[in-house]
Every structure is written in C-alpha cells, then in structure tokens.
C-alpha cells in the first residue's frame, strides 16, 4: 500500500501490520484463557499440569507483561516502523509473539511458588529492557522525521551508548519475562534471541 507522507512516498505494508495486531490479540487471549479460565482443561490434560494451582500473582505478571508488550509492539508496528515488512520478518515476529505470549504462560502459569526477589529482578529487567527498546526507537523516529537528517545515521540519545541499544533492550525484557516463569526451559528464548 503506497501512501504520501511528510517524508515522501512510503510503502507501509499496513496489511501485515494489522494482521500482526490481530494475531497478537489472539495470542494474548489464549494466554489469558490458559491462566484464568477453568474451562480450558484440555491444556492441563495435554501437559499433565494443573494450571489452576499456579500462583495468581505470577499469572498476573505474565499477563501484564503480555498486555504491556502488546501495547509497545503495536506502537512500534503502527507508528514507529516506517518501512515495509518483509514476509519472512512477519513470520519471525509472529513466532516470537507466540513464544512470549503463549510459551511463557505455558511454562510459568502453573508454578505455585510465591513471588520472590528473583521475580522482582525479572520485573525490573522487563521494565528496563522495555525502556531501552521503545524509548530508543522513539528518539530515532524523531530524528528521522526531521528532513535535515535525511541519509544520516542516528548516533544520539540512547544510541550513543550502543549501535543496537534497542536490541539490548529486547534481550533484557525477554530475559525478565523468562525469569518470571520460574522455569529453566524459558531461558532458551532469550538465548535464541541473542543468536
């Protein structure tokens, strides 16, 4: 889809961005249902795990992270991401959404342990990572929207600390989310993200 913007003619691939939003909404709904709907006994039966015995506050954290990520990623996809989304990136991001939204819930929502200092660390890491990722993108977006900066590389703001500070933020918030699950298998996700 072509659209005239202040910066000229831009291909937005709005269809894929809206499809991201819809799929991400479905993932969030599935995660919520696994955490809080007693009617979803098929998940318990498949994994032979009783999700109803999971710590309620851990479930709230897992779902809250999902909602926060949903809002952040839609801000990024619909507002900050100006370029066309290639189809392979669409499928890669969709797979990542499934791992975060549904995978972390499947791994952590059944854990009965009370929240502890490790969870506080996970929450802080999630918040700090979200800040580095999103705020750095907002700063770069402001820079790119200035016609005087056309063709220039952005090395100010948070990007003055690292070339890919936004990706550092990704690794932090995903690691924080994995920590909240209290499941070592969740550690595979941030490891895969760094490769």
Indicate residue ranges for each PLM-predicted region.
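Membrane-water interface of transmembrane alpha-helices
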Residues: 68-79, 132-144
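Hydrophobic transmembrane alpha-helical segments that form the core helix bundle
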Residues: 76-128, 134
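Hydrophobic transmembrane alpha-helices
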Residues: 5-49, 108-139, 148-195
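Alpha-helical transmembrane segments in multi-pass membrane proteins
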Residues: 1-100
């Amino acid at each position: 889809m072509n659209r005239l913007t202040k910066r000229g003619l831009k291909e937005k691939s709005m269809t894929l961005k809206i499809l991201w939003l819809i799929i991400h909404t479905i993932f969030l709904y599935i995660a919520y249902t696994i955490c809080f709907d007693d009617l979803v006994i098929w998940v318990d039966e498949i994994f032979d795990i009783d999700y109803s015995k999971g710590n309620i506050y851990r479930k709230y954290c897992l779902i809250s992270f999902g909602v926060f990520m949903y809002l952040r990623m839609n801000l990024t996809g619909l507002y900050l991401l100006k370029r066309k989304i290639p189809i392979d990136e669409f499928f890669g991001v969709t797979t990542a959404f499934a791992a975060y939204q549904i995978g972390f819930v499947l791994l952590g929502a059944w854990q009965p342990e009370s929240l502890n200092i490790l969870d506080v660390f996970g929450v802080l890491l999630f918040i700090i990572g979200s800040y580095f990722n999103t705020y750095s993108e907002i700063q770069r977006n402001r820079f790119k929207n200035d016609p005087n900066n056309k063709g220039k590389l952005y090395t100010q703001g948070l990007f003055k600390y690292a070339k890919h500070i936004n990706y550092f933020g990704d690794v932090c918030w995903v690691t924080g989310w994995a920590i909240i699950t209290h499941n070592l298998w969740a550690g595979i996700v941030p490891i895969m993200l760094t490769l």
